């Protein structure tokens, strides 16, 4: 599902927010963010290829660069400057767009919510074990899915992303949707593990960057966020101790105002009309909501 352009009377004057969802999700993930940005904002939340109502002339992508190619129409639709927001696998794609020479000049800000960029951890000895365990999980899921053990694969996938948080039973409808899209997971993992030189690319960014992590998330993504914050000049990192990996949805009431303010500040720095509903709050601590 696409959350298409929100009503705007200033054609060509505003930047556009492009929000990318997590694995096994859809663009509907961002309905609360659209509401937070307000009726004066432009937001596009596409379904990634293989999810929801997406369409692409390519086969399922095996690299993040191919994911970006599938989003070319969306990026063209945005027209001008872009604010990227991405969660989990969508965060990895957002990062790839922001560091792509074809698009980097159009990116005005970047918000990453626990992006899945595991090769970043391969570059560090102490973090290598997190990378290797995630690679083992990817191999197990691929074997399960290819062998027809889809339910087992979904259970392993959801258990991993629960991190240290409570295990909650998935609603039947959500479980069915995940089963229907399970094959896509193997491509998501392949694309994430194919991305190289993440540290160098991250250090090259010269735009406002906002990073989120949750204290109950897997150590993998918590460490990825910390590593990115360490190499991205001036990155604003926010840690929510009581949040899990799905904080983009479970803690939307906390993080969406921060994202909105981040986007507004980036537009102000660029001397452009605000892409959001004129919010300019300086939110500092998210520890307890």
Question: What is each residue range found by the language model?
Answer:
Residues 6-56, 80:
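Conserved HGGG/HGGXW glycine-rich cap/lid loop of the alpha/beta-hydrolase fold
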Residues 30-31, 54-60, 121-124, 222-223:
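Conserved catalytic-core motifs of eukaryotic protein kinase domains, centered on the activation segment
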Residues 35, 44-85, 89, 96-100, ...:
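Active-site loop/oxyanion-hole signature of alpha/beta-hydrolase fold enzymes
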Residues 99-100, 104-144:
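Flexible "cap/lid" loop of the alpha/beta hydrolase fold
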Residues 146-186:
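Conserved alpha/beta-hydrolase catalytic His-Asp/Glu region
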Residues 174-230, 239:
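Conserved serine/cysteine hydrolase catalytic core
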């Amino acid at each position: 599902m696409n959350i298409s352009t929100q009503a705007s009377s200033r054609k060509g004057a505003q930047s556009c927010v492009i929000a990318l969802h997590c694995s096994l999700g859809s663009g509907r993930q961002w309905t609360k963010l659209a509401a937070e940005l307000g009726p004066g904002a432009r937001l596009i939340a596409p379904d990634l290829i293989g999810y929801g109502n997406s369409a692409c002339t390519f086969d399922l992508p095996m690299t993040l660069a191919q994911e970006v190619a599938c989003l070319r129409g969306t990026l063209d639709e945005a027209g001008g400057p872009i604010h990227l927001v991405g969660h989990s696998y969508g965060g990895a794609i957002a990062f790839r767009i922001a560091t792509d020479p074809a698009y980097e000049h159009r990116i005005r800000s970047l918000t990453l919510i626990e992006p899945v960029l595991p090769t970043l951890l391969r570059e560090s000895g102490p973090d290598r074990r997190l990378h290797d365990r995630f690679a083992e999980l990817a191999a197990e899921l691929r074997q399960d899915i290819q062998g027809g053990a889809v339910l087992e694969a979904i259970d392993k996938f959801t258990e991993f992303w629960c991190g240290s948080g409570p295990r909650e039973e998935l609603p039947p409808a959500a479980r069915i949707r995940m089963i229907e899209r399970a094959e896509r997971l193997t491509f998501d993992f392949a694309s994430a593990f194919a991305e190289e030189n993440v540290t160098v690319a991250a250090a090259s960014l010269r735009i406002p960057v906002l990073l989120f992590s949750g204290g109950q998330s897997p150590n993998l993504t918590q460490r990825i966020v910390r590593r990115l914050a360490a190499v991205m000049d001036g990155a604003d990192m926010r840690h929510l101790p009581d949040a899990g990996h799905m904080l983009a949805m479970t803690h939307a009431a906390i993080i969406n105002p921060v994202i909105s303010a981040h986007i507004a500040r980036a537009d102000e720095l660029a001397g452009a009309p605000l892409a959001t509903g004129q919010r300019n709050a300086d939110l500092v601590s998210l520890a307890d909501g």
